[in-house]
Amino acid sequence: MKDLLKFLKAQTKTEEFDAIKIALASPDMIRSWSFGEVKKPETINYRTFKPERDGLFCARIFGPVKDYECLCGKYKRLKHRGVICEKCGVEVTQTKVRRERMGHIELASPTAHIWFLKSLPSRIGLLLDMPLRDIERVLYFESYVVIEGGMTNLERQQILTEEQYLDALEEFGDEFDAKMGAEAIQALLKSMDLEQECETLREELNETNSETKRKKLTKRIKLLEAFVQSGNKPEWMILTVLPVLPPDLRPLVPLDGGRFATSDLNDLYRRVINRNNRLKRLLDLAAPDIIVRNEKRMLQEAVDALLDNGRRGRAITGSNKRPLKSLADMIKGKQGRFRQNLLGKRVDYSGRSVITVGPYLRLHQCGLPKKMALELFKPFIYGKLELRGLATTIKAAKKMVEREEAVVWDILDEVIREHPVLLNRAPTLHRLGIQAFEPVLIEGKAIQLHPLVCAAYNADFDGDQMAVHVPLTLEAQLEARALMMSTNNILSPANGEPIIVPSQDVVLGLYYMTRDCVNAKGEGMVLTGPKEAERIYRAGLASLHARVKVRITEYEKDENGEFVATTSLKDTTVGRAILWMIVPKGLPFSIVNQALGKKAISKMLNTCYRILGLKPTVIFADQTMYTGFAYAARSGASVGIDDMVIPEKKHEIISEAEAEVAEIQEQFQSGLVTAGERYNKVIDIWAAANDRVSKAMMDNLQTETVINRDGQEEQQVSFNSIYMMADSGARGSAAQIRQLAGMRGLMAKPDGSIIETPITANFREGLNVLQYFISTHGARKGLADTALKTANSGYLTRRLVDVAQDLVVTEDDCGTHEGILMTPVIEGGDVKEPLRDRVLGRVTAEDVLKPGTADILVPRNTLLHEQWCDLLEANSVDAVKVRSVVSCDTDFGVCAHCYGRDLARGHIINKGEAIGVIAAQSIGEPGTQLTMRTFHIGGAASRAAAESSIQVKNKGSIKLSNVKSVVNSSGKLVITSRNTELKLLDEFGRTKESYKVPYGAVMAKGDGEQVAGGETVANWDPHTMPVITEVSGFIRFTDMIDGQTITRQTDELTGLSSLVVLDSAERTTGGKDLRPALKIVDAQGNDVLIPGTDMPAQYFLPGKAIVQLEDGVQISSGDTLARIPQESGGTKDITGGLPRVADLFEARRPKEPAILAEIAGIVSFGKETKGKRRLVITPVDGSDPYEEMIPKWRQLNVFEGERVERGDVISDGPEAPHDILRLRGVHAVTRYIVNEVQDVYRLQGVKINDKHIEVIVRQMLRKATIESAGSSDFLEGEQVEYSRVKIANRELEANGKVGATFSRDLLGITKASLATESFISAASFQETTRVLTEAAVAGKRDELRGLKENVIVGRLIPAGTGYAYHQDRMRRRAAGEQPATPQVTAEDASASLAELLNAGLGGSDNE
């Protein structure tokens, strides 16, 4: 027995390893793996089905076909194990060695490995510095290459055609050496001196200045250094020995009917062996050169096809015309080894079935069909039966279970008790897609699911299926119970709000229950408490909605957490009093004393969780559900056609609109409006009519008139079923009711343009044929969109997970003082997101001071929970600097303080939490709710876009920031700065509204002045951009020559004449170099200086500028000198929805990005070229000016002589994130991406915490480009991991050396995933071949830091519960311990096993 145990131990030995290295295999290494050479292309004997000797399935090389039995049958049984049969040469051992023993083929001529040849950039080409084309010509025997020039004038690596070679032979004889084929390339690679080459290249690099040459040299140096450091030899890229895959990994399976199913690899290997053997024979026979060459080329092609079929030339096809699957195809793509078998496996002990509702379940339960449970828990049942002595052997137990004896069911009940199972619904978009429940045995065949978890699973009961999995080991059960139980996942990880919220029927029931009604039965009663309320309701003495007075006892927590009771008489309704009975102690009565809609219920559960914690919340959620279902049933709310009340006014509204449309049509026919204007106006009219109809309809539905107790009429909220459903948030929306009872309105064509005749009918009246046909467009587009959206959203999630998968919380506090400044999100007059929502659950980076004092309100490193946020609001703080993952200083991973609160648990995040994956899921999961389309702006929208004034909504004081201004002659402020912001502050100094003020706006109120609500504070002309003078004096024209640089135009209506500056294209040759400008001089004719500088005030005028002043006129500061007409931007498409999110995360450059100033200084314009202007910025400190060419058609925001700061906008447009990072830094680009992504999600009403987007941004900023190397080993211009530069610089500074300087890079998520340090993770994501080729050449080590790599090598992941295991391993490693393997005797083992089973299965009564 002992031997057997030892033997079993030996069979399952595990290797402890810390990293995986990939490198080129040398021929000797391949031979050392091999168990013998495969010499023949035969596979198995078709009569005996035995493998042929020396063939591809040879038993002597690869091992026996049957366990412990040699091929000829001389040795059978375990006792002969390890014997090698002298007759057939097969070792007697397990057959599974056929999965691990490799063979090899000795190639008669070397062949190039296609990956290193054709995977761009070609490694062989880069190493030899030869073009790929030339190398291929040599390899495929079209030309010669010179290997050794000798004393001749031939250069090494020179390519010779057949003729040139023969000429050279005649001329030089055997002075030189030239060959063709892979031998030639092998000789070239072999004779390279890598270190020497490196030296020469580095010297060359220091001498050259041309950018392209430097790039090329750095590439070669990197490759050469990689070879030197990894110990790879260049000639190993040419194969002389080919490894053969173990036969069980490329099986040959006999089908019935004498046919065989085989892996494509066998075909590919057979071709290689056939050609190789033929080549050997030809060489032995000393065949003519041309025949041998042809055979060598064929061998090269066969090896290429085996390694990567189809990479070069046409793919080799099998008998059925489909390309054969080569070794490379085995590992790449969705069906490849990585994604199919290593990252996703099928698991045992699982089942799936349809789901139905389980409204009587508790939150932690699910209904499991008996049939399924019996099958899933079989091993446990067998064990239990044997333990009880009811079955003597496992076989007997099996029989009992198959007969389904009565005792089996009792045992099943025992086994299932307290044994959680996991339920999963595909697609699993976030971690709440798999949760644990305690099974309850039920009859029937469908799984019952608790209704409240449907939101998390996104499940409904229209035929959805779910899978059940059984956690087998004790640890797995523990994790399922502690971490995955549905009761532990009440809050959504995406936004920290409850995800266990009632919906649909439950909401309707609670809403119906808490509504009040005028003059209902029993109004005015005074009741002793909720119990009496329920009694009189059940007795039929009072209606649920009756307004009554009830004595209510509320409990409140004091400082010590004790409950203090207060009792009072409350005005409420019978229904609310009944509902109060299930509300847990500690919540105020006001929480139910209102008509409860979906939002209110969600808020109620949230409050409960924050005040009372997990357990009461779970019980409360369950109770609300039961109550909701019960009262929804009692309400009898139903929908009939009469509930859809059509407003009387509808008819007249539509006829008015029709009249207006007819009028517009007349104007169009008489030529007063253009076709475009007519179309836009018609659409506006119908849109307005539709709104009026729907408003009339909603007003009609919303209220009803009833007689109250005093006999008077009174308005009350309607009890119309449809309205109640929409109002409570149970189902439907105002827009849907509008289609039922209002009018359907305008429809779009398939291309997105709006059809100008609306559908005036609604669904109650019914549509006619034309209307129905028009409707079909939209309906079909909706379906097509949904299908596309799902795929796109899934792909976005996959890329996000891949880029963030290795980000884990690794330490408690990194100690940084960096952070990002959080302010409320304000757009125009609305606060889109208040400050408390943005800072809740974050850690302060600096002390927060009480506004206007030096008192510390919140100390540094405080986790801001709800109470702190209340304090901030009470003290009207409107900006808080909080820690952020983007600025976290941890080298690998992030620290808990920079992340803040774990949103799903409500406390600070634990170490080992996989925040990267959580972030990716939180952003990706709502992806399917985003729209797919780009929005076209036309009609009403585009006209409203040209604003010309700012009107504030609230009263308060004005605060201007980034402002330069002058006072004009009438005493008003005129803005002369570009990016001025106007904020409206309330009396506490909180920002209520925020607006952008353009250049040239005239302010009605100045900085710090008080305004009333509704007041207009700024005006400007939206169609022209003014040129405003900052000084007073007299105008002097310079270079303004009529006919050359300017032309006079007279307005026909007013008779005023104005000067228009000609565009440089329209000028005569004499006027090309003139620079028209307006100079301001004083009465003596001297230049006036711009205040604060020593520059004369002169304003250069761009083309098309209009001047309405004459030479020599007196002007005062703040006056408009000239106007530049702005072309109104045509209808620009706004990319919205999913494509916009993808663009942001992929960091794509917009089509026409904004042009930003690269340095601070004074703007001037240099010499123009065709179609472009030269913009020159000269720094004030006199360093080198910066030049940029800008296309003429771009509208510029700056004038000559203006001062700009680095990062200022020179020409408007969407900003490119790379520019923001380069010019304004990491925080600015974070703020930009976070805000832009949030805008898209906010439009759809999806809440995601900023943290998640910041996590992804941190991963996008993973790389840095070295600017100067200092004393480090980096090359300049090299892109390296930011953490590596940080660590290297820290070490260098500690030794007093100079560190490297670098700039951060922003990579898109796909690029960032492929650029990770881990080649395993990158290879399993995309472009497998390229990643593996690169890694092999560089001899990369994968440190297995991320989650993906560890899943692939089959270990616990270094996150969650696996985090401790990895920490422990590292500690043991550091201490140099060996993991102890205890010496166990068989008796001990079996005893402890029995003990464990008893303890684990609750049967320790020793029967």
Curated annotation (Swiss-Prot):
It comes from the Bacteria. Its EC number is 2.7.7.6. Binds 1 Mg(2+) ion per subunit. Binds 2 Zn(2+) ions per subunit. InterPro entries: DNA-dir_RpoC_beta_prime, DNA-dir_RpoC_beta_prime_bact, RNA_pol_asu, RNA_pol_N, RNA_pol_Rpb1_1, RNA_pol_Rpb1_3, RNA_pol_Rpb1_3_sf, RNA_pol_Rpb1_4. GO terms for biological process: DNA-templated transcription. Zn(2+) 1 binds at C70, C72, C85, C88. It catalyses: RNA(n) + a ribonucleoside 5'-triphosphate = RNA(n+1) + diphosphate. SUPFAM superfamilies: beta and beta-prime subunits of DNA dependent RNA-polymerase. Its cofactor is Mg(2+); Zn(2+). One of its GO terms (cellular component) is DNA-directed RNA polymerase complex. Zn(2+) 2 binds at C814, C888, C895, C898. GO terms for molecular function: DNA binding; DNA-directed RNA polymerase activity; magnesium ion binding; zinc ion binding. It is an enzyme of class 2 (transferase). Keywords: DNA-directed RNA polymerase, Magnesium, Metal-binding, Nucleotidyltransferase, Transcription, Transferase, Zinc. Mg(2+) binds at D460, D462, D464. HAMAP family: RNApol_bact_RpoC. The RNAP catalytic core consists of 2 alpha, 1 beta, 1 beta' and 1 omega subunit. When a sigma factor is associated with the core the holoenzyme is formed, which can initiate transcription. Belongs to the RNA polymerase beta' chain family. DNA-dependent RNA polymerase catalyzes the transcription of DNA into RNA using the four ribonucleoside triphosphates as substrates. NCBIfam families: rpoC_TIGR. This is DNA-directed RNA polymerase subunit beta'. The lineage of its organism: Bacteria, Pseudomonadati, Pseudomonadota, Gammaproteobacteria, Enterobacterales.
